[in-house]
Amino acid sequence: MPWASEPAGQPTGQPAVTLDDIAEWFTRRVGRELGPSPWHEVTPEAVRGFADATHDWQAIHLDAERAASGPYGVPVAHGFYTLGLIPYLTSTLFDPSWIDVALNYRLDRVRFLTAVPVGSRVRALARVRGVRVRPRGYLEVVLAVSLMVEGAEQPACTLDHTRLYTMRPDASRPVDGPVPRVMYPPERPAPAPAPAPAPADSLTP
């Protein structure tokens, strides 16, 4: 279901808004706080999956017994795992229905301030730092982001996150007011079926 309907009488095939309109929507929010995002649980399974994907199997992330004698006393998530949550968490802070493609472009002024214990919950706060229309149909949006751990006073990390967006052909102006908690991009799709094995005679020259 779309976030906002097209204006009545909109010509078929014409966008309800332009990229400049979307840029203006963000420009009016420069300096304003967005959020917080919904809470997100940092599960042991997710941390283990990240460890396997990045080959970072340090005991402070995976071994509760050894982590107990380490600097944090409990297993903690990888710093880059927490960074990897930023696009997902910040995508809940504004209406994403106009977005076709979202690209991570830059991370600046990244600071890891406190550890994120495995099993804790995190959420994001952000402020719009800047916005501009770039060549080839991209909108650049810079968010100053703080990732917060439930129960902690200090952010786990802070950073400036720059993303490039392209606009859907049928986009409408982002909705104002409370933001529906809808994730962009959509949830993980079901695994694709395995390809059929090639005939044996096709494998020989």
Q: Residue locations for each model-derived region?
A:
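Flexible glycine-rich active-site/ligand-binding loops centered on an Asp-His dyad
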Residues: V142-E150, Q154-R173, G177-R181
